[in-house]
Amino acid sequence: MTTIKQVALEAGVSKSTVSRFIAQNGYVSDEAREKIERAIKKLNFRPNLSAQSLKTKKNQLVGLLLPDISNPFFPMLAKGAEEFLKEKGYRVMLGNIGEKNQSEQDYLKVLIQSNAAGIISTHDFKEDFPDLDIPTVIVDRVGHKSNYGVFSDNESGGRLAAKVIVTAGAKKVAVVSGPLNATNINNRFKSSIAYLKEKQVDFKAFYSQSYDFEEIQKEAREVLANEENFDSIIAPSDIHAMAYIHEIHRLNKKIPEDIQIIGYDDIQMSQFIYPALSTIHQSAYQMGLEAAQLIYKIATDQAIEKSKIELPVHYVARETIRQKRKE
């Protein structure tokens, strides 16, 4: 009896591509379709439709794979996704994948074996796992190649952060970027720099490779010991901004009089530190909710109006930005 594996070998495609063709579930290119049809005819293959139906029936499980749940932004994102999915009768498996590829692979294996209905993740792993046929929605770090995604308007956010400090009289700015392999961070960083150049404001770029508070503190110490006499800082996240505030206090400098600083995310604790952090707000909860709604529509074969959803951002004025001087 001819198997799917034999058809795949004959057609020169993967087993999962043959499975999608037979189940009529998921994308198969015209070229692959023709090869499979020829192979099926040549090998006289007859699929077991009842077994295929059982195999392709999806479990009501959604994987939620996030990079660092110690960062308050991501638990709020998870809350938005989980509340919607639970209401729809779905279970959520939360995976703290960090930046380790092995952890991601381990979670993916479990989700594949469980025949999960979908995945919500900050990392688009289609390039690493091209045969993965579980519907996936990317959140926060959405690239051009992502099929489905929910993200904030990072370009506007980066520009807005720069505009706020320039309007408040910035003369020399430290622009801090998070890890540049993250699309969202990269877009913000470029937009902030473009605005500073446009307004001819002096700046220097610094690169942070961590979201760990203690590591960021070390980086902040080096930046502020730079003897550049920065009067303003654009931080890539509220966590970064808080680490810089801690270091500015240690140096006995006043915020915002000596150094003003703007964060990004508007996590809950940003309003409780001293001084309260001025920041760019993006809704982590709404991002998770929109991603969950999108994965639910995909899993239940509903019409999808937009495959990529961009959420607005806005400035939240608190105490770390100088008041605009009156003329």
Curated annotation (Swiss-Prot):
Residues 4-23 bind DNA. The keyword Metal-binding does not apply. The keyword Glycoprotein does not apply. Residues 1-56 form the HTH lacI-type domain. Keywords: DNA-binding, Repressor, Transcription, Transcription regulation. PANTHER family: LACI-RELATED TRANSCRIPTIONAL REPRESSOR, RIBOSE OPERON REPRESSOR. This is Ribose operon repressor. It comes from Lactococcus lactis subsp. lactis (strain IL1403). The gene is rbsR.
